[in-house]
Amino acid sequence: MPLIDKLRERISRAFYSHGLLCASYPIPIIILTALCILASCYPLLKLPLPGTGPVEYVTSVKDYSPPPLEPNPEDHSDQPDWYVGLPVAFIQQVLVKAVVSPWDKDFLAVDVFRSPLSRVFPLVEEIRNHVLRDKSQEKSLEDVCLQVTDLLPGLKKFRDKLPEHGCLLLSPANFWQNSQEQFSSDPDLIRTIHQHEPKTLQTSATLKDLLFGVPGKQSGVSLYNRKRIVSYTVTIALRRYNATFLDSLRSRLKRQHPSTNSSAASQHIVHVHFKEEIGIAELIPLVTTYIILFAYIYFSTRKIDLVKSKWGLALAAVVTVLSSLLMSVGLCTLFGLTPTLNGGEIFPYLVVVIGLENVLVLTKSVVSTPVDLEVKLRIAQGLRNESWFIMKNMATELGIILIGYFTLVPAIQEFCLFAVVGLVSDFFLQMFFFTTVLSIDIRRMELADLNKRIPAEACIPPPKPGAKRYDRQPTLRPATPHTITLQSLRNLRLPKRLRLVYFFARTRLAQRIIMAGTVVWIGILVYTDPAGLRNYLTVHVTEQSPLGGAVMPPIPVPVLSASNPHGPLSAVFPTGSSQLLENQSQRDSKEVIDSLSSRIWEESHPEDKSKERAAKIEDKAHTQVTWGAEDEETWRKLSFRHWPTLFSYYNITLAKKYISILPMIPVTLYLTPQEVSDARHPQEAQHSHPYLQREGKPDEAWARVEAKGAEKPTENQTPADVTLYKVAALGLASGIFLVLFFFLLYRLLCPKNYGQNGVSHGRRKKGDLPCDDYGYSPPETEIVPLVLRGHHMDIECLASDKMLLVSCCLAGQIRVWDAQSGDCLTIIPKPSLRRESSGVFEYQDNWEPTPECKYNPEESLENGYQLKRRTLHPPLFSDQPDLTSLIDTNFSEQPANEESGARQRLSCIKQESPPIGYDFSSLVQKVYEEHEVSSFGSFPLVLSPAPYGQCQLSSGRRSQTPAGCVDGSCARRKSSTEETTGYCNGSSSPAPSWTDSFESSVWSLGLQGNLIVVGRSNGNLEVWDAIEGSLRCSNCDGQSGITSLVFLNHRVVVARLNGSMDFYCLDSQKSSNQLQFRGAPNRSNVPSSPLYSTDDVIGCQRTHTVACAHRKPITALKAAAGRLVTGSQDHTVRIYRLEDACCLFTLQGHSGGITAIYIDETMVLASGGQDGAICLWDVLTGSRVSHMFGHRGDVTSLLCTASCVISSGLDDVISIWDRSTAIKLYSIQQDLGCGSSLGLISDNLLVTGGLGCVSFWDVGYGDLLQTVYLGKCEDSQPARHILVLDNSAIVCDFGSELSLVYVPSVLEKLD
């Protein structure tokens, strides 16, 4: 077993055991969880309610004056309301950057910061002693600074570190009481600086941050400081603003400690206003969010039937989320983490989102389990189903947090610390508290259901003991199977609120969005934060990488002389470092001219150049101090609690007040190696290791390179620095990481078969509860369908038009049904005929056939018997007019005539009527004049082809009896109320008779109005009257079987087996009488197709013939929107114009024969073939729009909606595709043999067939809405074909029977 599977199995087993534990002992677990919550929230008792971050307002330094005490109502500027009166203090910071230059390889790691820190004492003394001498007075720092008194009583440990009873001036010198002697005698500076640091994690202001004035990681006080630059500030709090004094102090410090490449462009004063710490109003959005959360969960769970207490579950969810927030903040406070502006405000809302989604996931998983299981098993199974996904999401989130923490960006690290605590606490509460509460609620639901099911007798108290009575007790009724009705079920489609809930629970969209947003946020901060990766790489490359190298000459950079750092600038040309271009642009013109002149002088004196290079062996590398825009507002990198914490030590509150932060004063200090040696403590040489000894001593490499450069001064050598290679490797690693990250994100968000094989859940089976994604099994019901019986063989063809349904079986019998009542209206041929195995009809009695053609009309007409097959020969009197319409065939009250058929017929014609009888002369004369060919029993109807292939039959009154076949001739049997005459114009060549048609199979069928068009295997095309069962027209020109036909309006197009097509037009010689067939009695449905009267003479005129439409048999034929589309075994699809049979396009795109075609009035064309592919085509241009592979066999049927394409195949799979993107949305696995049984009731409702059942699906969502079983399922047959009627009914083909099923009304309303 693979490692992943083993891990997954162990996780599932652990969650299953945990679910059993929570459901078995709910009360102890809830009590234990409550104690854990209270213990975690205990630190919150000492924490005030969180306020909001400070607000800033910026003004210019030039002409600054403090605002008035009261706001001016006439002032319409944009200054805030709080900007009134003097601030609590004006903060002036002197930012110091100190570096040892040049650096010697023998220096210790502690030398990086000991000597720079030693310079803070004279700097502080210089600031304290600065005096501004004016004409009339002198002003010192004591006159303008903020005077403070004692510290708070609880800060005794800070008494010797923070100033008291004097100016509020802070610097690193406060660690040693501003005494340089204590500093020099301190053997361990790191221990002294960190002795008051909290042992726990801390993000708020610490003593080190207060005194250094910069974040601890940027101070450079570390044994592994590769930059060798130490930064700290001297912070001065001023009581009033004196611009003259501050300008003089700035000028003096710049003069004494010049910062040559510092722009100091900031000329603004930032006023920072701090809101009230306890802000109840600030908590209103968060409280509102939790109220909305409670209401949303309640209204969502109202639609979940398996939850007993909706209020209780919603309350438990809110308590879970709120407890998770409180536990997170409490644990963070316990470990020294306090919410800050960046992480604290959004954190409660992230907890709400993540907690809500986890609640939905657990609820959905548990209520999706089978209801017949025990409660603890349901809880355990629900947890097991979601265990892998919960742990996978948890691991992904922790991995992202871990990566973010090691970016070393303070804001990201702080957020990651909060996120870890929040995720762990939320996971704890979800697993222990909410799961246990959910088990209690489901157990209450189960008990309530049991109480409802207890019979009334069980509630009767037991009788009192007394005399035994032996009366007969009534037997209990056995449990009988019941039918689930739609009224007792929940809504077939889930409500929108639950669909949204389960959508978030199924996809975990919120957590994935948060994870993606966190990654993007971390990436942005890494590359934009002043302390981020971008600045690190810039400084690192600037300090150690030779830009240009051998490609371009090194640009001279002026630096301070090592012997005299305070003296004038001298041009020194370091070969091991280059200056940033922006720093070079900041030099004055004099420096550039001096550099260029020095360069020219060096080129003209190569001997001096060699000497200078030899001297640089000792001066290994100068570290240049750079100043950037991020240094102008270093205070922004501090915690927003920095200033309130500082002033709170002196009992000064900043709530509802503001402070003004002045532009900083830059100071650059360069320390010589001699100063480093003088400041070193004797004990440090024994305990400290050389600088960067563990990192490979890069300075030795520099020394070797410089030595080689001195030996070969004529060669342009570049120091062997690998920083560029490190940067390149880091960039390559970042690129690989991004590629892998986006790949994993793709695999996480997108399914494995995205764009090819549909969604990840694959095929949906009815047995596997296809609605499991939403937690519900589809409702099932059983109804008694309207069964249409009558066929003795399997049904092969089905057709419908409005209220009529036509079916044809393999025996060639055509039946016309009423789609509303299920009554059989007409049988073609008549029900008294049946076909032998050879295909010819015979009598159903036992009279013996004779080898000769003899016929007794009275006997046949009276008894309605069928003839057996006899030898075909020309009938008698075939050249005489048919006078059968003159015979009264109502023999029910007359004795049968025993004479022979031929003599009786002749005597009936020649017999003169009695004087008192009826005169038939006028009627006989009319018959002779019309020259109609007899269609009576033994007289053949010669259907010779006309010059244009026209053949006509005229029917008289309405037929009541079916037609029969005698001796190979087609005839119709009449009653007294009917007379029929036949007419066929054309040549005298014999044509096939009706019996020939009956002996051939029906290959295709079409119905429109009251006309049925039949295409037979022998090539004959017949038009029948669906109501009377009479043949209205027949065309016998075809020599090849009709594989398919289209009956559209008055046009009939037939496709033949040899690949040809014939276009016919149906017309009538009389005006059409648009009768309205109303189906069965008491029906009022009117079909839209034209209905012809029995008096109409229907003509079938062939208008066009396409001799070679395809090179192989035509297997598919569809017509719509004036276009005719054909598909053939030659792998092509052709589009014809219906009106003139003109071929417009030949479409090639299949590698197999075409098996299915779909086209509608919107000219949407789809084709499917034996290769299992589906192609979508543009009918107007003939181009292929999309190509989809979705079946392992032939595509049997195609359907299209406005947004989907539905295909089915021989693999018994129904695939639903997105029409615009050609992406498979989902698949439906059908029962064996039911792959092609599907139909569209509407664009949103699909019906499919199964073993003795039909199922209704939501096309848009793939939900199984309902399964309807048609009778018993033990001996059920597969539904092979489904035909959707216009009256909200469907017809299912179950072998030789048809089942008429009406769509449930709930589904109609749903659609």
From Swiss-Prot:
Transmembrane segments: 19-39, 278-298, 311-331, 343-363, 400-420, 422-442, 513-533, 724-744
Bilayer topology: Multi-pass membrane protein
Sorted UniProt keywords: Cholesterol metabolism, Cytoplasmic vesicle, Endoplasmic reticulum, Glycoprotein, Golgi apparatus, Lipid metabolism, Lipid-binding, Membrane, Repeat, Steroid metabolism, Sterol metabolism, Transmembrane, Transmembrane helix, WD repeat
Keyword Nucleus attached: no
Cytoplasmic side: 1-18, 299-310, 364-399, 443-512, 745-1311
Main location (coarse class): endoplasmic reticulum
WD repeats: 790-827, 997-1034, 1037-1076, 1109-1146, 1149-1187, 1190-1227, 1230-1267
Region (Loop-7): 529-726
Chain ranges on the Lumenal side, renumbered to this chain: 40-277, 332-342, 421, 534-723
Record localization: Endoplasmic reticulum membrane; Golgi apparatus membrane; Cytoplasmic vesicle, COPII-coated vesicle membrane
Region feature Loop-1, mapped onto this chain: 46-282
Renumbered ranges of motif ER export signal: 445-450
GO cellular component: endoplasmic reticulum membrane; ER to Golgi transport vesicle membrane; Golgi membrane; SREBP-SCAP complex
One of the record's GO molecular function terms: sterol binding
InterPro entries: Beta-prop_SCAP, HMGCR/SNAP/NPC1-like_SSD, SCAP, SCAP_N, SSD, WD40/YVTN_repeat-like_dom_sf, WD40_repeat_CS, WD40_repeat_dom_sf
Domain SSD: 282-440
Annotated family: Belongs to the WD repeat SCAP family.
Function: Escort protein required for cholesterol as well as lipid homeostasis. Regulates export of the SCAP-SREBP complex from the endoplasmic reticulum to the Golgi upon low cholesterol, thereby regulating the processing of sterol regulatory element-binding proteins (SREBPs) SREBF1/SREBP1 and SREBF2/SREBP2. At high sterol concentrations, formation of a ternary complex with INSIG (INSIG1 or INSIG2) leads to mask the ER export signal in SCAP, promoting retention of the complex in the endoplasmic reticulum.
Protein name: Sterol regulatory element-binding protein cleavage-activating protein
Organism: Xenopus laevis (African clawed frog)
